[in-house]
Every structure is written in C-alpha cells, then in structure tokens.
Amino acid sequence: DLGLKDYMAKKISLSKILELDEKTITDQPLNCKSEIPWYFLKKLMMVNVTARNVKLASDCDLVKDNASRTTKLDLMNLLNIPNTGASLNPLDLITALFLCSDGFVQQELALKMSMCQYSVPLLLPNSDTEQCTLMLWALRGIVKKYRPPALSESKGFMEERIVSSELPLISFVRLGECSLSKSEILNKLLSNSQQYHDTFVHHNMECGDSPRRISNGLAEITWYLPCGNKNMDIFSEPVAIANLRGDIASFETQFSFLCQTSAAVFVFFESGLSGFKLLNHQNYKSQIFLVGNVQSRTFSLNDLQEVASQLCLTNTNIILKNKNMNDADFVKCLRKTVSDAVDNQHNKISVEKMASVAHELGVLVEEDSAECQAGKKNADAITADIENILQYKKDQLPLRGQIWSELTCLEKEEFRLQKVGSQNIEHYRSNLQEQKSELRKKQNSHAMSSVMTCFISAISSQCIERSYFLNK
C-alpha cells in the first residue's frame, strides 16, 4: 500500500509536491511503503539520478550483522537471508504516481525524469479500466538540444520541443518469456564505451527484480540525440526509442500502436510458433526484426524458419545470439542493425502526430480533456497569427510600442532633469506633464485589440482551464 488511494480521484497537485517540511530537508531511510512515493518525488524534483532506488530498510542488513558477529560457520543461514526491501518495482511506482497526478504534475515528472536521463511514459496503462493513455501533454514540457551532422562544422545546434520533433521511432517488444534482458541490452545499446547509463529499469538494477503488478503494458520512450562528435555518437541522426513492458500477446493494442508509428520494431522471442500468430495479424507500417537467443532451451530453428517465411523476412531481419557471441558482441551487432534501419527508413513521426493513431486504436489521449482543449484553443487564438513578431506587437499590443517608450523617457526626465539647461524648472516640469498627458490620450484612443480580448477572457476562465492556457 503506497498510501495513494486518496489521490485516485483527487489528483496530486504541483503545490503538494513542492511543499517544504521536515522530511523534505532531511534524508532519512525509508521505513514503510507509504513513504516511498514522496521520497521518490523529493529526489526527482532535485534531479537526483538515484531517485529510482526506493528500497526499504530491510531485515537483510540485520541478518548480515548477526551473521558477522557469530564465529560459527552456518552457510544455510547465509542462503536464507530475506530480501524484504526489494518488494516494489520502480516501474510500478512511476505508473502509480502518473495515474494519481494531475496533468501539471505529470508534465513536471516527465521533465525531471528526462533531465535524469530516465525513460518516460509514452503509453500509460490503467489496470482498473484496462485502457492505456498517450501521454502527449505530459511530454510537452521536454525541450531537447542536439547537433546533427549538418551543423557539426559550424558548431551549431537544434533546440525544439520533443513532442514536435519528427524522428524515426525504433520500438523494442517481447513475445513470450525471454532469457535475454531486453531493457538491459537497450541500456548497453544506448551507452557509449566511455559511459554506461541505466535509461530503462531492468532486472539487475536495485529493486528491478521485484515483480511488476501494474506497470505491464507500459510503453516508455527515450531519445538518443547526437552531440556531433563522431567518436562518441552511437547514431549520427536523432532517434526515438520505445520499450514496451510485458508480453505483446497480452497487450495487442500497445503493440499495434507501436507497429503503426515505428520505423522498425524489434521483437525479442524464444517461444514456439503459437506466439507468432500475433505478428501475422498486424497492419505493419514498420520493418520487423526478430531477436532471439539460440542457447535458450525453448529456441527452435525450424519454428524460426517457418515464421520468417510467413513474414517474408531475410537474414538482415533476424539477430541471433549464439554460444560464440558475448553480450558486447551481441549489442554491437544489434546496434549496427538499428543504425542501418534508421538510415534506410524515411518513416518519421512526432509524438503530436501519434495522437491520430491513438484515436484510431481507441487509445486515450490525455490532451482530449475539455479543460485542456479549451486552454489550448485560447492559446492558439493568440499565437496562431504570429509571423513577424515586431509587426505583431505593433498591431496587437500598441500600448507597449512607441508611445510607451516615449512615456518612459519623459518620466525619467521628470525625475532626473538632465535636459533642463537654463529653463525654469517648474515650467520645464509642467511642459513634461503636458507631453505625458498627450501621450496618455493617444493611448486611450486605441481600442482593445482582439488578442487582448482573448487573453483577458482566457485568464478569467476556471482555474484548471486557465492553468492549461498558461502552460501551453
């Protein structure tokens, strides 16, 4: 019990997670599960990369202390050390917090997770309703910088909202049980030789081996963005990477979504023919690649041959880890295949454009809420006509133009009297007051512009709608 039941209806607000109390300024060990969400939020708001380490103070340390104090040899006692701390999977925690937070907290969580180089939710599952939601609004706050090859010589860079960036999406999914750790392999694939980072939670991380209860069906996304250094860049072009948690046989909607939005889908498998029937029924807009472990007991070369024939796959679409291949070689081979898939594909998509695919498949989009749409409509009414910024300000904000500039100059002169010369001071000030009065009359002669009318209407709307408007 994470103590979040009260927030299923009344969501966690931004003001709540920004509250300061004694626990905020101290770093005490976790003693119960109800402390975990707030501990995670505190660490995440500080952009602490250890935020996902949410292990409780367990009995394991006590048992080890007791064992170290005794002089007797008792190997069975060492084997039976309980592991009570690793009972909550970080993915369950993240899923629970996103489900229990309002849109503005979700946006802040996604931004801070991205800053920590964590993957962020793309499709959020809800085990109560058995539906998933495209987290478009939550990702809108993420802005990324990168340097494509075209700008490497000039040392320039591109900066844009990640939801608007049209990038090739490469998805990784699992069919049936698999001895290969898909997420750990992905982390190695995205890390260069000089620096390893756990972008995705995996089995060998702290608490990563705890059973998932509510996060199966979660599709996470991260982005690989080049820095322009050929010696460090893994991919020369920016690419989005999606990772679906759980067996695609149980989450066909999420799998269909990824098949229709991705440039390539890599399917990790080891099971027999029965599981592959799902692949035959998909409407593919992406290349399919099969990734398997030859050393697995359930691997069958004959089954793979039949499936590859049915899907019209060639050797380039199949990556196998054999007994002569270690993890480093396997990751290198997989990385080369991903790189080729990115280079040979022109199928690019933005997260914004994924919304239309989501609607076709019955996937919810959190931006479809009435308050968000109203706030977005009001914001678009103000920004839609902006082409030439200076001309726009002159037409729509005339009180901030030349008249305002002249007024400020007159007010400064009224107090400083730098240009009074030999004139009578009182007469000079009176003249300045007359000039100010004339300028005020000019200001008052302007009718309220349409943009200001829209702004006043939007800022006077209901609280949630106004917040969406200001955040747009």
Regions from the language model: what does each represent?
Residues 1-472:
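Conserved GTPase G-domain substructure that encodes guanine base recognition and part of the catalytic core
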